[in-house]
Every structure is written in C-alpha cells, then in structure tokens.
Amino acid sequence: MKIGGKIVSATLVLMGVLVGLIMVAMSLLLMDYVSKSTESEMEVATSGIKNELEQKKTQMFQLACGFAGNHELIRAIQANDRKAVFEVSKKLVKQMNAEYLTVSDASANVIVRSYDFEKFGDKVDNQFNVKTALAGKPIAAVETGSQIKLAVRAGAPIYDAAGKLIGCASTGVRLDNNHNLVDDMKKQFNADFTVFLGDTRLSTTIKNDKGERNIGTKSAPEVAETVLKHLVLDGTLFGS
C-alpha cells in the first residue's frame, strides 16, 4: 500500500536488552502519532523497517565471513603483530566499504579495533556475535556494546590453516551515530523516525529550531508508555 503524500509521524525504537550471559533481544516499536494514519499503513512501515534491518544483517554477515577468511589477516594474527593486524584491518575496511572491524583472539580479548589502535586488550565476550563466533558459528544480530552503543553486528570465527580457532572478526553498521537508516525511512514513508537506546535518542530525523538533530535527549514518559502499547516487532538473528 502506498502512503503517498500523507505525512505519518512515527518513532522507531531499538532497545537492546541483555538476556542471561549471551542473548540479546531487540524490539522494534513503531508509533503512529497522527490519528488519520491507518493500521495497514503502520504495518507497511513496520515491514519496511524489518526488511531494511534484515538486509543489513545479511550484508554484515557476509562481510564478517570475508574478513575472517582473509589470509593476510590470519598471518598477522599468527605472528602476534598488532600493528600488522591493525593495518590489514584498516585496509580491509576501506576495500569493503565497511564501517569498522574488531579483531579479537580466541579468548575474546580485543587485538585491534580498526578505528582506534590504542583501544585493545579488553574482553568482548559479552557481545553475542563474538561469543557465538568463538563457539564456531558466524552470526549477525542487533546488539549494544561498550564502544559502539548500538549496531547491526556480525561475528565470524577465524581459523588458521590447520583449522585451529585463533580469533573472531566482528563488524557491523552503527545505529548510534549513523543517520542513514532514519533518513532513508523518512524518505520512504514520509515520516519522522527516531532510534532510541532505552529512553535516549541516538539518531533521529527530528531537528530543533537550530536545525540540529535532537540527539542525546530523553523521551517523555508518556511517549514511551504510548509506544509500548503499539505494534511490537521482535528482531531476529541471522546465522549459518
């Protein structure tokens, strides 16, 4: 169904919730603020959001698997050469037009982050994609993180030539400071969209009177309560 010229004011809420040690549940909530908007229009918009995220999961899954199988990266890890791992990671990110690549060892200790050479040594086994990859299964999902607050993440195990697990390649597309998702959704559905983590706006098409995006602001309690009464679409995982 075409929404056409009708303006629908909507909010996309992405809330990452850790379940147990490894499970991450995401909820996508789409809210209609205009009474003229129909339920069928909201279903179309919700379906569009889901399809967009599924496409990103597929893309990130393929990227992670490609990074994990790169022979130059594998050799650098085996040589225990952080600088080489960093340089290879930056090159791969540029070649594949990716946002970032985080390489960790078999114990989930970060070897390098392609965007910050000095930030390493911390454990990332709290990330579902990393923990799953180090268990031998590549996977993609929407997750929260310590450095990158919200992203579509994918992790893939890295093996040496003998088939020994030596690490994990984790990549993704950021949702916390990347406004392409909400901007694309606004163009497609003639609506305003906001990405929330909890009740804090991470990305939004809504701007203040200075023309700046309302990033970092909180949602009003009554808005959150209303959103939770509307359609909820559970996020899904993508894996091999």
Regions from the language model: what does each represent?
Residues 112-114, 120, 175-240:
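Intrinsic low-complexity, intrinsically disordered coil/linker regions enriched in small/polar
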Residues 43-85, 105-125, 130-131, 158-172, ...:
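Extracellular/periplasmic ligand-binding regions of membrane signal-transduction receptors
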Residues 39, 43, 61, 82-90, ...:
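Short amphipathic alpha-helical segments
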Residues 86, 93-170, 221-240:
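Extracytoplasmic/periplasmic ligand-binding sensor regions of membrane-associated signaling proteins
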Residues 2, 174:
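Conserved acidic
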